[in-house]
Amino acid sequence: MTSRIGVITFPGTLDDVDAVRAVRLAGAEPVELWHADEDLKNVDAVVVPGGFSYGDYLRAGAIAAIAPAMKSVVAAAERGTPVLGICNGFQILQEAGLLPGALTRNEGLHFVCRDIYLDVENTSTAWTNQFAEGTKILVPSKHGEGRFQASEETLERLEGEGRVVFRYVENHNGSRNSIAGVCSENGRVVGLMPHPEHAVETLTGPSLDGLGLFQSVLSTLVS
């Protein structure tokens, strides 16, 4: 039976179509979810994609975090459903309380758009278990507010518990500890700023490395 992965669309979402394609290329059935609907249609996992939900008013991700669909995502995550937040989706998961830290204006206050290398630091999460230890992946990065910030106590906890999932090889936005992505305590909720869904085809992406995240969650769902 094919796994079903939901992709949420908010007003201002940009990368939902790309996430849907990545899910399909990985071998799962994508299910389009609307922000105003509480019904997650019995999906097996959820992707919260990037963009500028609600125009980033108040704070990036702040309004989207209280949308009906996100209330259901929080409840599903608490039951163990795998959830991936990409870029603005990462911000939304933080605002919803599913992931720690905050994402602020980039160092230098410029929007950055380039292909970057990430170290995969934790290969045991629901979204990274198909990567080998020590793997570097090449994926696009495009954001103006991607600088990971957290208190010293939170940073120590994340590092000590192995919850830093991705780390920038070259820290291009000033993130604390070069953190690009983190996970929940159980490793089933992952958020990262760069865009794996844009690295799934050689024609349009810098590599196929992004497919690994979507293939990993399929492995999680069938295990």
From Swiss-Prot:
The protein's annotated pathway: Purine metabolism; IMP biosynthesis via de novo pathway; 5-amino-1-(5-phospho-D-ribosyl)imidazole from N(2)-formyl-N(1)-(5-phospho-D-ribosyl)glycinamide: step 1/2
Instruction: Give each disulfide bond as a residue pair.
Output: none
The record lists the organism as Corynebacterium jeikeium (strain K411)
Sorted UniProt keywords: ATP-binding, Cytoplasm, Glutamine amidotransferase, Hydrolase, Ligase, Nucleotide-binding, Purine biosynthesis
Instruction: Report the GO molecular function annotations.
Output: ATP binding; glutaminase activity; phosphoribosylformylglycinamidine synthase activity
Cellular compartments per GO CC: cytoplasm
Q: Where in the cell is it found?
A: Cytoplasm
| UniProt catalytic activity | N(2)-formyl-N(1)-(5-phospho-beta-D-ribosyl)glycinamide + L-glutamine + ATP + H2O = 2-formamido-N(1)-(5-O-phospho-beta-D-ribosyl)acetamidine + L-glutamate + ADP + phosphate + H(+); L-glutamine + H2O = L-glutamate + NH4(+)
Q: Which Gene Ontology BP terms does the record give? A: 'de novo' IMP biosynthetic process
Q: What this chain does, per the record? A: Part of the phosphoribosylformylglycinamidine synthase complex involved in the purines biosynthetic pathway. Catalyzes the ATP-dependent conversion of formylglycinamide ribonucleotide (FGAR) and glutamine to yield formylglycinamidine ribonucleotide (FGAM) and glutamate. The FGAM synthase complex is composed of three subunits. PurQ produces an ammonia molecule by converting glutamine to glutamate. PurL transfers the ammonia molecule to FGAR to form FGAM in an ATP-dependent manner.
Query: Where primarily located?
Result: cytoplasm
Q: How does it assemble?
A: Part of the FGAM synthase complex composed of 1 PurL, 1 PurQ and 2 PurS subunits.
Q: Does the keyword Amino-acid biosynthesis apply?
A: no
- UniProt entry tagged with the keyword tRNA processing: no
- Which protein, by its recorded name, is this? Phosphoribosylformylglycinamidine synthase subunit PurQ
Question: Which residues are annotated as active site?
Answer: C87 (nucleophile), H195, E197
Q: Name one Pfam family in it.
A: GATase_5
Q: What is its EC number?
A: 6.3.5.3, 3.5.1.2
Q: Which SUPFAM superfamilies match?
A: Class I glutamine amidotransferase-like
Q: What PANTHER family does the record point to? A: PHOSPHORIBOSYLFORMYLGLYCINAMIDINE SYNTHASE SUBUNIT PURQ
Question: Which InterPro entries does this UniProt record tie to the protein?
Answer: Class_I_gatase-like, PRibForGlyAmidine_synth_PurQ
